[in-house]
């Protein structure tokens, strides 16, 4: 495919205000969904993350791994159970979860980023007590809710030019048991603790939709709560919007729910006027170049 050099130059020029705006910003990216099982999509995601780092953004990647967990549990003959969309995690299951998330999935993402010329280091919520949890719900077993965060290790990594890749498993507060943490929940807690400029939740849908099925480009927290109350937001989108509202309450500037299957979704959201998906925020955007 022949590229128009003039159009390429124009695109780069139009990105300048955003490059200035996001220089030094912390952007937490939750990577999950079908893109995780596609090598080409994984490579494209990694390339976007490396580019963000190269132009001065500090990306922190948090990942899920549900399909891979289900696959290994099936091979081991361990039945998967879910309550209100969350995995029931008994002792046998949590060992598999940790093996898949901290081992297989985490290292695949790290390798993909390194293959694109980045410097990535994989850790879990256990490392340096990044996340300490209590049980989220007795019905769910070893599913954790983060109650203490130590994100200095993440700052140390990105200040050294390294991209942290975090597996959402954590240590229990009371007895040092291992807990599985929902990937969106972990990403929101990390973003809040870092006071991140953006939290990007990559999914397999285009964003939050209204009652007619149209994707909404932006919402306020009060609008989100109203849509949940009326049932317009339902199913799997409810926990994602709950994560978004909790992150905003914790000090994150804005949360974006976007389709991770779209090529260059993260770059479109961060560096273009159009953005991608649905942005949820309480304040007006700051998208203009700095005035000297």
From Swiss-Prot:
Keywords: Amino-acid biosynthesis, Arginine biosynthesis, ATP-binding, Cytoplasm, Kinase, Nucleotide-binding, Transferase
Reactions catalysed: N-acetyl-L-glutamate + ATP = N-acetyl-L-glutamyl 5-phosphate + ADP
Pathway per the UniProt entry: Amino-acid biosynthesis; L-arginine biosynthesis; N(2)-acetyl-L-ornithine from L-glutamate: step 2/4
InterPro entries: AceGlu_kinase-like_sf (IPR036393), AcgluKinase_fam (IPR004662), ArgB (IPR037528), Asp/Glu/Uridylate_kinase (IPR001048), Glu/AcGlu_kinase (IPR001057), NAGK-C (IPR041727)
UniProt-annotated site: Transition state stabilizer, residues: 30, 240
Gene3D superfamilies recorded: Acetylglutamate kinase-like
UniProt record, GO biological process: arginine biosynthetic process via ornithine; L-arginine biosynthetic process
Main location, first listed in the record: cytoplasm
Compartments where located: Cytoplasm
Domain of life per record: Bacteria
Any Pfam family the entry gives: AA_kinase
GO molecular function, one term: ATP binding
Keyword flag Isomerase: no
Function summary: Catalyzes the ATP-dependent phosphorylation of N-acetyl-L-glutamate.
UniProt similarity note: Belongs to the acetylglutamate kinase family. ArgB subfamily.
Record-given protein name: Acetylglutamate kinase
Gene: argB
């Amino acid at each position: 495919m022949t590229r128009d050099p003039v159009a390429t130059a124009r695109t780069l020029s139009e990105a300048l205000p955003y490059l200035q705006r996001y220089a030094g910003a912390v952007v937490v990216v939750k990577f999950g969904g079908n893109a995780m099982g596609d090598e080409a999509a994984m490579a494209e995601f990694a390339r976007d993350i490396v580019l963000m780092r190269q132009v001065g953004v500090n990306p922190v990647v948090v990942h899920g791994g549900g399909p891979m967990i289900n696959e290994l549990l099936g091979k081991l003959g361990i039945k998967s159970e879910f309550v209100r969309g969350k995995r029931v995690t008994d002792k046998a299951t949590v060992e598999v979860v940790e093996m898949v998330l901290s081992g297989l999935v985490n290292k695949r993402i790290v390798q993909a980023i390194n293959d694109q010329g980045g410097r990535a280091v994989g850790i879990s919520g256990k490392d340096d007590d990044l996340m300490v949890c209590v049980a989220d719900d007795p019905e769910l077993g070893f599913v954790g809710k983060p109650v203490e965060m130590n994100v200095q290790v993440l700052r140390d990594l990105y200040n050294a030019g390294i991209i942290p890749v975090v597996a959402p498993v954590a240590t229990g507060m009371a007895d040092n048991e291992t807990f599985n943490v929902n990937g969106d929940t972990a990403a929101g807690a990390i973003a809040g603790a870092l006071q991140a400029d953006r939290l990007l939740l990559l999914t397999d849908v285009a964003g939050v939709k209204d009652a007619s099925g149209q994707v909404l480009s932006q919402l306020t927290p009060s609008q989100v709560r109203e849509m949940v109350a009326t049932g317009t937001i339902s199913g799997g989108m409810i926990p994602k919007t709950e994560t978004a509202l909790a992150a905003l309450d914790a000090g994150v500037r804005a949360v974006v729910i976007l389709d991770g299957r779209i090529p260059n979704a993260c770059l479109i959201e961060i560096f273009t006027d159009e953005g991608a998906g649905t942005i949820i925020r309480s304040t007006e955007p700051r998208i203009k170049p700095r005035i000297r």
